[in-house]
């Protein structure tokens, strides 16, 4: 390593987050911040990339990077193989957390809540707009299972391509979406001297409460 980890740091000076400028609805603030990220972040950065954390039946946490593919007043939607490790973990414990980090804006959003499957119709609607290779991959890959080597995966894909040579692939039953129904959404804005701004929204009595947290 060319630089000591202890010496790696930066000052956050771009912006602030005040209660006066923050809407009472966290979904409105998330949309504002997401739109800012789309305008500011540049490829190869993906503004809809997020860390998804789940917990298995033994209480061990697991996290990985996914892409947000839907947002409405109900919650935040992502898609995956239901038989994958994350799918099995969500079946055992249907709660999860998401984190979005937009470094160019010095912003982070943390979301916690319960998780439900979206309807088959919603899964199919998204599946049908995916690139053909991704649709075939959803059939070919036994996600999270041990395979012998890369050649085995390529053989599985070739078999799938032959299977659907004369017809478009349909959405597999083992693949689809989840929606995280937020109970808590925290917005973090980097500030100088590590005195960051943190606004914490929580579900309460059919609406949302909002509090400032110490950094």
Curated annotation (Swiss-Prot):
Pfam families the UniProt entry points to: PNP_phzG_C (PF10590), PNPOx_N (PF01243)
Cofactor note: Binds 1 FMN per subunit.
Alphabetized GO MF terms: FMN binding; pyridoxamine phosphate oxidase activity
PROSITE patterns per record: PYRIDOX_OXIDASE
Segments crossing the lipid bilayer: none
Gene3D superfamilies, per the entry: Electron Transport, Fmn-binding Protein, Chain A (2.30.110.10)
Subunit structure: Homodimer.
Reactions mediated catalytically: pyridoxamine 5'-phosphate + O2 + H2O = pyridoxal 5'-phosphate + H2O2 + NH4(+); pyridoxine 5'-phosphate + O2 = pyridoxal 5'-phosphate + H2O2
Enzyme Commission no: 1.4.3.5
Protein family: Belongs to the pyridoxamine 5'-phosphate oxidase family.
Record protein name field: Pyridoxine/pyridoxamine 5'-phosphate oxidase
Function text: Catalyzes the oxidation of either pyridoxine 5'-phosphate (PNP) or pyridoxamine 5'-phosphate (PMP) into pyridoxal 5'-phosphate (PLP).
Involved pathway(s): Cofactor metabolism; pyridoxal 5'-phosphate salvage; pyridoxal 5'-phosphate from pyridoxamine 5'-phosphate: step 1/1; Cofactor metabolism; pyridoxal 5'-phosphate salvage; pyridoxal 5'-phosphate from pyridoxine 5'-phosphate: step 1/1
Primary gene name: pdxH
Cofactor section: FMN
Biological process annotations from GO: pyridoxine biosynthetic process
Residues that coordinate or bind substrate: 9-12, 69, 126, 130, 134, 194-196
Positions with a binding annotation for FMN: 64-69, 79-80, 86, 108, 143-144, 188, 198
Keywords tagged on the record: Flavoprotein, FMN, Oxidoreductase, Pyridoxine biosynthesis
